[in-house]
Amino acid sequence: MLSRLFAPKVTVSAHCDLPCGVYDPAQARIEAESVKAVQEKMAGNDDPHFQTRATVIKEQRAELAKHHVSVLWSDYFKPPHFEKYPELHQLVNDTLKALSAAKGSKDPATGQKALDYIAQIDKIFWETKKA
């Protein structure tokens, strides 16, 4: 009796963990822009409390950017994309490494490098959306 009460009524499945069409590299770009902006602000303020707060925010935003790039790589891009863009695996890896470097640095050049990589992913992403 109890087993029927708690048994699933409907079984569903999906090919992804998000509804289709939600993916967009803009999410990663916005977070990476925040990282670079914080790095620039850190250069102009020596207050130790500000530096601590800025470091926490910068690290959080870098992790969010890494998350969004990882979701694109693992959930959006499919084998046909990797066949058409064989550089995509390395590009994602380089982007994640650049975001890690920006996370651990006050130098806005590291934030810009991450943004440059994200721009390359963005270009490929929108090309795949046209197909």
UniProtKB/Swiss-Prot annotation:
Gene3D superfamilies: Nickel-containing superoxide dismutase. It is found in: Cytoplasm. It catalyses: 2 superoxide + 2 H(+) = H2O2 + O2. It is an enzyme of class 1 (oxidoreductase). GO terms for molecular function: nickel cation binding; superoxide dismutase activity. Its main location: cytoplasm. Keywords: Antioxidant, Cytoplasm, Metal-binding, Nickel, Oxidoreductase. Its EC number is 1.15.1.1. It holds the Pfam family Sod_Ni. Residues 1-14 form a propeptide. Ni(2+) binds at residues 15-16, 20. Its cofactor is Ni(2+). Belongs to the nickel superoxide dismutase family. NCBIfam families: sodN (TIGR02753). This is Superoxide dismutase [Ni]. It comes from Streptomyces coelicolor (strain ATCC BAA-471 / A3(2) / M145). The gene is sodN.
